[in-house]
Amino acid sequence: FTANKPQIRRIIARRISKKERFNSVAYFRAHAEEIGRRLASDLREGTWRPKPCREKLIFDDLRDKWRHLKVPCLYDQCAHHAIMRQTIPDIMARKYYYDCGSVPKAGQSRAVDILRRKLKKKKPFKYALSMDVHHFFESLQAYVVIRALRKIYKDRRFLALHEIVLEGMGGVLAIGFYPSPWYANLVLGFLIDRF
């Protein structure tokens, strides 16, 4: 793991800029240097352990269903961002182009653009299929994600950090954790490669 203190400080600054209304933000702002130093050393030495996360039930008006969120504490969110900062380029390199999941530059807007382009061709297609895996995050076990990560990384300490993140989620991908959509897209990419 190679995140240095300036990178960690930038991650902390970004995280607290989006969460002005929480009490822990004032503490993080006042002690950003110390927290950044501690987080960098915890991640480098492998001593970081996530705290129990807050659980929340919200109603998603768009999908007309209830969602069970797990919200990690701010320190753990910064750790997730630091770990994923080094993982995301490798996931994006292996990502299936037509997988329009919830990651930047690959959401609904890309799906609509793809469909528009396909429909403009001279021979329009007769059928189209849009699929959504029912409760995909909750059904994706941690060992499957670790198996996919082992195909990319050989560094045991870095894999151990990912295992710790997955343990903090509760053994399955949790809605509300920053790494969850990235892990889901990684596993989908490997599944598509197999078939």
Model-derived regions: residue spans:
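Non-catalytic, polymerase-adjacent accessory regions of viral genome-replication enzymes
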Residues: 1-42
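Conserved pre-motif C helix in the palm subdomain of viral-like polymerases
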Residues: 65-96, 137, 170-195
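Active-site-proximal segment of RNA-dependent polymerases
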Residues: 80-141
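Short coil/turn segments at secondary-structure boundaries
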Residues: 24, 51-59, 94-100, 127-131, ...
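Glycine-/proline-rich flexible loop or hinge segments
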Residues: 14-27, 59-70, 96-97
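Conserved polymerase palm-domain catalytic core
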Residues: 116-195
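Non-catalytic, well-ordered alpha-helical scaffold segments
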Residues: 6, 33, 37, 76-81, ...
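Reverse-transcriptase-like RNA-dependent polymerase core
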Residues: 42-64, 78, 153-168
